[in-house]
Structure formats: C-alpha cells, structure tokens
Amino acid sequence: MLIVLKAGIDPSYAPVGSAHAALAGYLEWEDDDLTYEWAQRVFHKHIKMATPEQFEKAKSEKYGDKIVITESSLGGEEIAIVYRVKEEYAGFLNSLPKWKVKVCSCPTKLG
C-alpha cells in the first residue's frame, strides 16, 4: 500500500493521516484480490512525502484508484492520499521521498 502525505502540515497529523489512509484504503478495497493478499501476507505500507505541488500531481487520475484523506480539525484540509494496492506504482510516486519520523525531546515524566 502506498500513502502520500502532504508536506507542510502540522507534523503531529502525519501518523494520524497515515493510519486513517491505511484503514480507508483497506475498507474501500478489501474485496480486491491484491488487497486481500496484501492484508494476509505482506502488510507493508510505503509512506511518502510530497510538496503541495507534488501532492496535487499525485491526485491525478493517471496514478490509479485513490482516496484523498482530509482532516476536520484542520478545516477539511487534504493531508494524505492512499492508493489501491498494486504490484508496482508509477515512477513519479516511487520517486517521492520516504516520510521520516522526526524525533522530539519529550519529557521523561508526565505530570
């Protein structure tokens, strides 16, 4: 499964957007043979990052079936795209950089 996140959103929404995208894609295409095989065997999710311009290009019909994920707490802003599971994705989508988790310095104790 391939998920594209839009760069420039609040970083705290990236994990939520990815999770929502993966679930939305699975529920939409769960009866598809490749999706079923992916869920039963592989279950890898490739999460890519796209500039706003690349994100718009990634929404193009030529890249196949997709769902655009919006975030209500950001006023309905589009934050992610999930694509139907395929054997291989178009070169443009593969060329996008992987999303990298940014480590923060969090308090060691809550309270």
Language model feature labels by segment:
Residues 1-111:
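Positively charged, small/polar-rich N-terminal and surface patches that mediate targeting and assembly
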